[in-house]
Amino acid sequence: MKELVFYFDPISPFAYLAFERLPQVLAGCSHVAEYRPVLLAGLLQHWGQKGPAEVEPKRTWTLRHVHWLAQQQGTELDTPAVHPFNPLPLLRLALASSADMRPNRRVMQALLRHVWVGGADASDPARLAALTQEIAPVLDPAGPAVKQALREHTESAVQAGVFGVPSMACDGRLFWGLDALPMLHDAMTGGTWFEGPAWAREGQPREGVQRR
């Protein structure tokens, strides 16, 4: 059985679309999935990147693109009333949903659809209260243990080379983005390309012009 780690932050529409599509992509592949919350802003800060929403033309394109992608894969998607927003309460709620701080698929679905279905404000206090009641956390989402776990998840993701969400890890390989799902499927079902030299070769340092 394959072990898959799915790194996510609900602020990302691509994480939502990838989550919704994952069962179809991995149908027939024996696997167990761990959904691991990470703070995308922390990843971006570490790697010196800006998020798509921080570059206005890129933000516009990204939102148009994800709506088209959602239509193509038959997934309901509505841009939340406020975006970007502070995802920390949702990330912590995901961790607090179980004693081992591993949210299950039901929790993930509730969390991501809270943001990406309906077009409401994901940070609205009344909506957050209703979501918390639905998920029924067994730990305190605002407690120090949950906060520390999120920091550790984000730091360990950086150490694993995660630079964005969604990212999927399996068999020591890291796959990034919604469009990497077919590649992930190929890797998890014994695709022969992964037996060749290209994966290792393209991970080697190369010379190149450095921006000053």
Regions found by a protein language model. Name each.
Residues 5, 17-31, 110-212:
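C-terminal cap of thioredoxin/glutaredoxin-like
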Residues 4-10:
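Asp-based phosphoryl-transfer active-site loop
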Residues 10, 16-115, 198-212:
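Structural alpha/beta surface segment adjacent to cysteine/selenocysteine redox centers
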